[in-house]
């Protein structure tokens, strides 16, 4: 017991309980679970220690009882559940004592009942610990999300990345880029092409009008920028060169007025963060290599470059650095490569390395602010998803699948919620959650997918059938349902046929259930043996009859009708083979067919024609 009391989890638990003079079951479980302690193993000993400390352990049921009892004592005379007056102080004490006696047993049973491998129970327990939000808190979180998104958007619109990225968007919308979407040339799947086409339509609708007027100037600016890059000019020249700076400011002022969509904000911000990671990696690599060569500045770098070119200085470098010339050359080359990559990044972002890192840090702060507020709003409303999902059980999907689909709808609701309209978030989110759940039932509940509009028609027929069953006391006919819905009888029958559920091939058949339904279903992939035999006999008979014809007529018929498994050749193709005209081949074919129509030959094939 002494060793147990010295463990961090139990020490924290006792400290917390001594301050409050009481503790609840949930608090005991949460504190132990926070320190990674198996609750069920230590629960007996922990409860004994709490009893020795004269600390009361209350269950959640007891807290509810206490609230109810004292509400009855303080309020007006009310029914006590059996028509009596409010509880007296003695009855209150008796009930609380009875509850205390059961507290220990309740806690032990709860710990055993929640299995560690039951994800549904664990999930429901976790989301139950989240506190609900007030309308003011929802507005505050929405404002924080808006603020985080605003930080990211401001950084992107003020950065030099905006102009090159919009130039690439404009180029992707040009006619040359459209040719790449040809499946024959691209070698991509239909899905990939359709997704790219959808994204292209979105970009064209959002930015097409602006880019149509700015693209020629953007192309001219990018050409000037490329010339400066090829000359080896530093990135600061973009702000110092008068012509480039004038063109750049003009284009940026136009692009900053464009309303960026969420897809572009997300893509640009991810590019900033990914590039910042690359920059930090390049700088670490460069610092490591410079330490190996004892380079402090650019002057030392040039000295090593000159030293490697002169044999006498090369030997001195080897002696100073303690490595071979080849190794020095390799490290020197690596430094040059990293320097070129960093310079390339500066030109792509039209900013210095320090400026890019500073912007990336600001974007990261905006992302953290946005994510924290978004997660808080989502977690506080997970119980709403569960309550809505309960209404859609037994419709083809498991309860937990419905909850997860509803969670997807909740995430979309958080992203699209407009707090300025004055509605409470739960009112708005309910519609998104319902839509996500009903759509998932329509798409996934059936083995064979049925379109959503057909699902709606099936629901109408089912609803009317149920109402007519209650009205007539019997199953309604198709005509009665059609009359009620103002449909045709054929449409009702069609909807009913679509509504039929698939049946398993393993369904047992017969009284003894010694066979399954699959045993009686013909295999469409296997050809009927009698038909195969019949075709072989027909082939042999035709070959025998054709052998009685002259060789030329036999060959013409074989080529014209593709009797050897080849395709049927045209008169012109057969004529080229025999080096005669099309008309001559037609005459030979007609003569051969006339011979075959003789009863002596046709009688042999008549049986095959009847079958």
Curated annotation (Swiss-Prot):
One of its GO terms (biological process) is DNA-templated transcription initiation. PROSITE patterns: SIGMA70_1 (PS00715), SIGMA70_2 (PS00716). Residues 377-447 are annotated as: Sigma-70 factor domain-2. GO terms for cellular component: cytoplasm. It is found in: Cytoplasm. Keywords: Cytoplasm, DNA-binding, Sigma factor, Transcription, Transcription regulation. A motif (Interaction with polymerase core subunit RpoC) lies at residues 401-404. Residues 456-532 are annotated as: Sigma-70 factor domain-3. It holds the Pfam family Sigma70_r1_1. GO terms for molecular function: DNA binding; sigma factor activity. Residues 545-598 are annotated as: Sigma-70 factor domain-4. CDD domains: Sigma70_r4 (cd06171). The keyword Cytoplasm applies. Interacts transiently with the RNA polymerase catalytic core. Sigma factors are initiation factors that promote the attachment of RNA polymerase to specific initiation sites and are then released. This sigma factor is the primary sigma factor during exponential growth. Belongs to the sigma-70 factor family. RpoD/SigA subfamily. PANTHER family: RNA POLYMERASE SIGMA FACTOR RPO, RNA POLYMERASE SIGMA FACTOR RPOD. This is RNA polymerase sigma factor RpoD. It comes from Treponema pallidum (strain Nichols). The gene is rpoD.
